[in-house]
Amino acid sequence: MPKLSVIVPTFNRQVLLEKAIKSIQNQDFKDLEIIVSDDNSSDDTKSVVQNLQKDDDRIKYFLNQNYKQGPNGNKNNGLDQASGEFVTFLDDDDELLSGALSTLMQKANEGYAHVFGNCLIEKEGNLSKEFSGKGLEKDSEISKKDFLMAKFSGEFFSVFKKSLLENKRFNEEFYGNEATLWVNLYKEKSFYIHKAFRIYRIFRQDSVTLGASKNAYRVYLGYLELAKILENELRMSKDKDYKKTCASYYKMAAYYAKLAKNYKALYKCLFKSLSIKINAPALILLILSIIPNNMIEKLSKIRVALCKN
């Protein structure tokens, strides 16, 4: 049994997929398997993988036949096939930096069930020195509360014990919102290394925003689930620090409910947010709830642009 399973979910990216796999093969950490989970690609993905398999029997190819097509179902397919004690995911359009896996696994061997680091952003072919993960500035242990309070955000790269997930999987009804599964990674000791381990490629800066808008109801479901997780934590721990974040998640659920034109869910989540903690964003959204969606999206883009400047 390999120590580490590297899962590479893929769909119609045969050229970039080969680069991703080779970046794994070039790692100095060798006790691993490479699980390629193909979401029924229509290009030559399978042939690319088969050619690489000729010289490396650690590479395994699995067609996603048991889950719905889509990022979450494809990742679940990969998880089902992983046999390593530890697991990590590498997107098919990303690459690992030299020494990434050995550094993370060395820290894991010190008794950490979850170790993660940062990524370098590559925008439209230009590699920058900018980290994709925000909020963490030094090597440190990370608690479940840090995660739930959203003290850090963005793209990171991690290795974790597969046992932390037990039999839990990504919810196929959600669009994104992986945090509903990642919360399980903080059951045991977690450690963050303030260093880049992966190249995170962004081809269109607005692609995530556009995707979220087109799948607004599924994004709403994810935020609603996150809010419920926070509310349960608040109820169990009596820690008032959770109130602000919990209210914020209900507000985000309300925002996407509006984009999905589900007004019953919109007002239910807004009033839930305000009942937990009176907050300006929820009040503003309540006022804006009568404004058409296309205007809300334009105002949101203006706000993001102003925050960057």
Swiss-Prot record:
Consequence of gene disruption: Loss of the glucose branch in N-glycans. N-glycans however contain the entire 6-mer, demonstrating that Glc plays no role in determining the length of the GalNAc backbone. Cells show levels of colonization of chick cells similar to those of the wild type.
Transmembrane segments: 273-291
GO MF annotation terms: glucosyltransferase activity
Principal location listed in the UniProt entry: membrane
Sorted UniProt keywords: Glycosyltransferase, Membrane, Transferase, Transmembrane, Transmembrane helix
Top-level EC class: transferase
GO CC aspect terms: membrane
Presence of the UniProt keyword Membrane in the record: yes
EC nos: 2.4.1.293
GO term, biological process aspect, one: protein N-linked glycosylation via asparagine
CDD domains attached to this UniProt entry: Glyco_tranf_GTA_type
Catalytic activity: [alpha-D-GalNAc-(1->4)]4-alpha-D-GalNAc-(1->3)-alpha-D-diNAcBac-tri-trans,hepta-cis-undecaprenyl diphosphate + UDP-alpha-D-glucose = [alpha-D-GalNAc-(1->4)]2-[beta-D-Glc-(1->3)]-[alpha-D-GalNAc-(1->4)]2-alpha-D-GalNAc-(1->3)-alpha-D-diNAcBac-tri-trans,hepta-cis-undecaprenyl diphosphate + UDP + H(+)
Topological relation to the membrane, as annotated: Single-pass membrane protein
Compartmental location: Membrane
InterPro entries for this protein: Glyco_trans_2-like, Nucleotide-diphossugar_trans
Assigned protein family: Belongs to the glycosyltransferase 2 family.
Purpose of the protein: Glucosyltransferase that adds he final branching glucose to complete the final heptasaccharide structure in the N-linked protein glycosylation pathway.
PANTHER family tied to this protein: GLYCOSYLTRANSFERASE (PTHR22916), UDP-GLCNAC:BETAGAL BETA-1,3-N-ACETYLGLUCOSAMINYLTRANSFERASE-LIKE PROTEIN 1 (PTHR22916:SF3)
Other facts noted in the record for this chain: N-linked protein glycosylation in C.jejuni consists in the transfer of a heptasaccharide (GalNAc-alpha1,4-GalNAc-alpha1,4-(Glcbeta1,3)-GalNAc-alpha1,4-GalNAc-alpha1,4-GalNAc-alpha1,3-bacillosamine) from a membrane-anchored undecaprenylpyrophosphate (Und-PP)-linked donor to the Asn side chain of proteins at the Asn-X-Ser/Thr motif.
Protein's recorded name: GalNAc(5)-diNAcBac-PP-undecaprenol beta-1,3-glucosyltransferase
Organism: Campylobacter jejuni subsp. jejuni serotype O:2 (strain ATCC 700819 / NCTC 11168)
